[in-house]
């Protein structure tokens, strides 16, 4: 099966004008635990971290020391297993054009991995999906956390973000990491098999308007709860139209989680300020209720472990 898929993938190289194709572990939301495990689809590798580059005459699978033996067992028949550190400024091949899905990489990743010795070509269609697109999709709605759990309302958190935007003399913040949207709005979801992260993105401006970029059916509860206005819920399919109808200005994007696709899209409308999303730091500072709940969780965990022993 893997050999057949590799052959099908390589058959597309000529059509797209590429010498190889890159497949990361993450999905469009940069999650390691996605329903769409394209790396497993093309390599049979089931570890939580890895990266494949398929060339016309060679297949490379990059993994860290945790997975060296596992990768050999699962993928060694079709792939050369390489230490993950060697992916930086990779010189295993040179002067090639590597195709990739711009939704799956940040511009920093591309510079770090490919551009010293090779060129990249952005391909709008994911080539793995063209040969295998039988992934399960979750359509369960997002839900809000109980006020007794979070300790801080989403309105207070939004005020902190507004202050950050103004301090950086900008007009918008684009929150591309779903876990940061979850923190800001105090919501969770069912999109990933082992994590309650809601797959969505968010834009917020200096006038306290928030625009949730999400599949409509997943966010209906948030409209009922008046966390999001109906007109401010943006289906990803309508994103181009939405951007055309809002004011220009300076927008802050996160260097860790904003994909090349979104960076290119936003650059057409805004002046970009590339900076770390402030929510990473904000959410690391726990409020009193969060600290109390963490202590209680450790107690419950200790009781469960003691009973097991």
Predicted features and spans:
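N-terminal accessory/capping or targeting/presequence segment of soluble
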Residues: 1-92, 105, 109-244, 299-300, ...
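Conserved catalytic alpha/beta cores of large enzymes that bind or transform nucleotide phosphates
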Residues: 96, 222-277
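Divalent metal-coordination and catalytic microenvironments
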Residues: 98, 294
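Well-ordered alpha/beta subsegment
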Residues: 100-102
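Acidic, metal-coordinating catalytic cores used for nucleic-acid/nucleotide bond scission
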Residues: 104-106, 257-258
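Terminal amphipathic helices with adjacent charged low-complexity linkers/tails
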Residues: 115-137, 259-293
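C-terminal helix-coil-helix/basic helical segment that borders enzyme active sites and/or dimer interfaces
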Residues: 306-309
């Amino acid at each position: 099966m893997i050999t057949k898929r590799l052959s099908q993938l390589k058959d597309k190289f000529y059509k797209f004008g590429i010498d190889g194709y890159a497949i990361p572990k993450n999905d469009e939301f940069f999650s390691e635990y996605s329903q769409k495990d394209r790396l497993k689809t093309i390599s049979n590798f089931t570890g939580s971290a890895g990266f494949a580059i398929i060339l016309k005459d060679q297949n490379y699978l990059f993994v860290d020391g945790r997975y060296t033996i596992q990768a050999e067992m699962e993928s060694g028949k079709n792939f050369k297993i390489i230490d993950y550190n060697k992916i930086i400024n990779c010189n295993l091949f040179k002067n090639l054009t590597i195709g990739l899905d711009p939704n799956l990489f940040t511009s920093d990743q591309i510079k770090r991995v490919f551009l010293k010795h090779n060129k990249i070509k952005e391909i709008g269609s994911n080539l793995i999906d063209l040969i295998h697109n039988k992934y399960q999709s979750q359509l369960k709605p997002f839900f809000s956390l109980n006020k007794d759990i979070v300790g801080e309302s989403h309105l207070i958190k939004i005020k902190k973000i507004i202050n950050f935007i103004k301090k950086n003399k900008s007009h918008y913040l684009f929150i591309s990491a779903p876990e940061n949207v979850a923190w800001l709005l105090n919501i969770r979801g069912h999109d990933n098999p082992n994590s309650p992260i809601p797959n969505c993105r968010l834009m917020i401006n200096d006038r306290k308007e928030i625009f949730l970029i999400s599949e409509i059916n997943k966010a209906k509860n948030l409209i009922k709860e008046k966390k999001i206005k109906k007109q401010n819920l943006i289906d990803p399919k309508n994103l181009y139209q939405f951007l055309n109808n809002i004011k220009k200005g300076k927008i802050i994007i996160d260097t860790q989680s904003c994909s090349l696709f979104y960076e290119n899209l936003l650059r057409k409308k805004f002046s970009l300020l590339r900076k770390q999303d402030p929510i990473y730091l904000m959410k690391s500072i726990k409020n009193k209720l969060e600290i109390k709940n963490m202590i209680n969780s450790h107690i419950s965990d200790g009781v469960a472990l003691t009973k097991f022993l």
